[in-house]
A protein has these predicted regions:
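Hydrophobic, small-residue-rich alpha-helical packing segments that form membrane-like cores
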Residues: 95-105
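Glycine-rich N-terminal segment of FAD-binding domains in flavoprotein oxidoreductases
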Residues: 20, 24-90
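Short small/polar-residue motifs
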Residues: 7-9, 89-92
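Conserved oxyanion/phosphate-binding beta-strand-loop segments in alpha/beta enzyme cores
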Residues: 3-23
Length: 105
């Protein structure tokens, strides 16, 4: 986990209160994550994916699960690995292209 702190601009939280809060969503399931990561940039997400890939190549089991509001009713955003919460910093609408009907969030 300390390696992650050095490669991203965002925050990493593994306090008991945070892990408890992220151990459930709107479903009946409960799974405690290793830590919660709050990326500040898209670049942070790319670095996290690269980190996980390198760890897996080294034989370390690393799981990244993206979570937003935690309202899923199927347990989808729950994981024993790292939770990537994009709702803290990556929560604004960027470029909107009405002609192509696309937008960047």
């Amino acid at each position: 986990m300390h390696d992650i702190l050095h490669i991203i601009k965002g925050e990493v939280d593994s306090t008991a209160a945070t892990l408890r809060a992220y151990s459930h969503d709107a479903s009946i399931f409960e799974v405690t994550p290793r830590a919660v990561i709050y990326p500040k940039t898209v670049g942070d997400i790319k670095k996290l994916i690269h980190f996980a890939s390198k760890e897996r190549q080294a034989g370390v089991d690393v799981s990244l699960t993206v979570r937003n509001a935690g309202t899923c009713m199927s347990g989808g955003p729950l994981s024993e690995g790292y939770i990537i919460d994009v709702s803290r910093h990556l929560n604004h609408i960027g470029h909107v292209d009405t002609e192509d009907r696309t937008l960047w969030v």
